[in-house]
Amino acid sequence: MTELARLKFYATQPHSCSYLPEEQATTLFLDPSQPMDVHVYADLSEMGFRRSGDHLYRPHCQNCNACVPARIPAARFIPNRQQRRILKRNADLTVTAARPAFKEEYFELYRRYIETRHADGDMYPPSRDQFSTFLVRDLPFCWFYEFRLEGRLMAVAVCDLLPNGLSAVYTFYEPDEDRRSLGRFAILWQITEALRQNLEAVYLGYWIKNCKKMNYKTQYRPIELLINQRWVTLN
């Protein structure tokens, strides 16, 4: 482990929760002057931290613990029947790793995705500046995985490649291709990629029991949840 005790953290003032509107949220951030070291990041991911843009953070709410960090142990994952169908349905896609960059092709897909799937969220309306600040960061461990069908961009999975696993930062995809279940396929592909690179887990961010948008995360079994500072397996 790195010397985490030497790190500084800052908590925000309470603000509206983007997942549970009736709750007030507080977020704990790693000191932004701290260099984004991949080993520090990996250790903090074990403690439930996530990356957004140039910041590492985790919920630090006074009266709520609904946001539960979740990860899939890659070597123990077994796809169910529906997931095997999704893998088969998308076997015609090719996946290529690219460095983070702003491209109109990326942004147009991102824009359509946000406008179609998340028009009620705090990322709407999408803008080029928002896209760049959120996703296009010059970090050596960050990758854009492009999913293409005969050259056509179908999805982009933004991932951080850490010593202890793949951290799924964000995925956006073609909103008119419901039959393919591209979001779910991207997670299945990341599990396969983690195995290929001998990585322990795929970090999915936070699972919230009472948030329907988060339900998909517990469809991948077994899954591990960080409860009382311990990773607990949910089979």
UniProtKB/Swiss-Prot annotation:
UniProt enzyme class: transferase
Primary location group: cytoplasm
Superkingdom, taxonomy of origin: Bacteria
EC code: 2.3.2.29
Keywords associated with the record: Acyltransferase, Cytoplasm, Transferase
SUPFAM superfamilies: Acyl-CoA N-acyltransferases (Nat) (SSF55729)
Signal peptide: none
UniProt-annotated location(s): Cytoplasm
A GO CC term assigned to this protein in UniProt: cytoplasm
Catalyzed chemical reaction(s): N-terminal L-glutamyl-[protein] + L-leucyl-tRNA(Leu) = N-terminal L-leucyl-L-glutamyl-[protein] + tRNA(Leu) + H(+); N-terminal L-aspartyl-[protein] + L-leucyl-tRNA(Leu) = N-terminal L-leucyl-L-aspartyl-[protein] + tRNA(Leu) + H(+)
GO molecular function, one term: arginyl-tRNA--protein transferase activity
Pfam families: ATE_C, ATE_N
GO biological processes: ubiquitin-dependent protein catabolic process via the N-end rule pathway
Family named by the database record: Belongs to the R-transferase family. Bpt subfamily.
Alphabetized HAMAP family for the sequence: Bpt
Job description of the protein: Functions in the N-end rule pathway of protein degradation where it conjugates Leu from its aminoacyl-tRNA to the N-termini of proteins containing an N-terminal aspartate or glutamate.
Protein's name according to its UniProt entry: Aspartate/glutamate leucyltransferase
